[in-house]
């Protein structure tokens, strides 16, 4: 590639194939804070597969990762410039301050005690940029911690303690079972029933959301990482954890009357108004796994009796004034991790990297600049 010297390697991460790592490069002549704003060229480098230019298809037949993105597009449509999941959202910024408890668990510089710049994105679940803020879907809190030495820690958190699939191969069928039949304009109820009965664990997140209050604010809802991660400290002692962000404002949901009277778009305006008056903050905690806890199935919660430790404080003190912003070209890949933190062998976690890159490549040509 003739312009290789202009390429910047943004991140590298494992996949659910043990012999395969994926790295993301962006090649361009114009960058802002390391992220490309014009003429992007993505290169997906997979060990054993050579270099694959995106957005061209990885192969003539859709790969499992492409099938996931295709299923999202089948359900929600191809919305120009929008993320295929969490399409409706807003960029925000702030900082994180780790504490001594965090340092005891991980050697990551995120827990140094100094302010770490954070780029955030709040979102409404699903692939439609016109989704209602009153819908019973997940709310998302995606984060990128910009650490010393060029390290990056990314995560994609949701407002439910469980993920919606237990295995990667359930992802595309889950979406397809909910996709409208062209003849009726609605999902086939028999197809959906059959899928749910064959995959009961995929109904757990929806069951949780059906009983949870609809969030009144992005800043008044809990967010979970859902997957397990391995923290390793300076003494080379390891501990598996799942993390959780608890709003300092408390959890606040809409009343029945508010659900009737509120518009479909209120979360972004509410967040801007809130942060303009005073920063929004979250307590970052981790639940410590014990030997019997499930590390590889994100649809299974750990017992409430497990010890939970506060490892720092996240503060959001800025919200983008409009579309676009510093978060638009970030994948928020949950296996883009710093030293001192490793992914578990959860196949769902490891399978999320490649679809994130494919999704990014498809929306980049139309992304807000």
Give the label of every model feature segment.
Residues 58-369:
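Active-site-adjacent core segments of small-molecule enzymes
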Residues 16-19:
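Intrinsic-disorder-associated, low-complexity terminal segments enriched in Asp/Asn/His/Tyr and depleted
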Residues 38-57:
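Gram-negative bacterial Sec-dependent N-terminal signal peptides
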